[in-house]
Amino acid sequence: ISLFHGFFEYDIVNDKITRKLDLPIPEANKDMALGDHVLNSGHHGIALSGDDQTICVAGTMDGYIAIVDRATFEYKTIPLSDNPKEAKPYWATSSKDGTKAYVSISGLDKVSVVDYATGKIVAEVPVGNHPQRVRNGQLRLK
């Protein structure tokens, strides 16, 4: 499913796919050659909110962040640039308290902070060249 623009819900106990969500492909990307997908990914990063109710998807090749209601699969997209091939959101990780998602925007050299409750970007942090994976950490000072 590497080149898929969306995701599947999978029942581990019964070993079957229970639902599939196709997320939108911008018009500019509909004729994209398979070899033009970064790391063979349509959408790459995915995170789940702390209450397990909301999913954040990094639409890597589509230039948006998707916020998805886990129960209904209804979603909204947050466009990151006028050119869907420019932003390249790459990874999504939930905050330690589970209320926000951190999404690395590799093509724009920043990390966006998305509030799960509102589905809006609440902060953007400029970072070094081409951020990829995002992790929570703790700095201990003596």
Q: Each PLM stretch: what is its role?
A:
Residues 1-142:
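Predominantly soluble domains enriched in secretory-pathway, periplasmic, or organellar proteins
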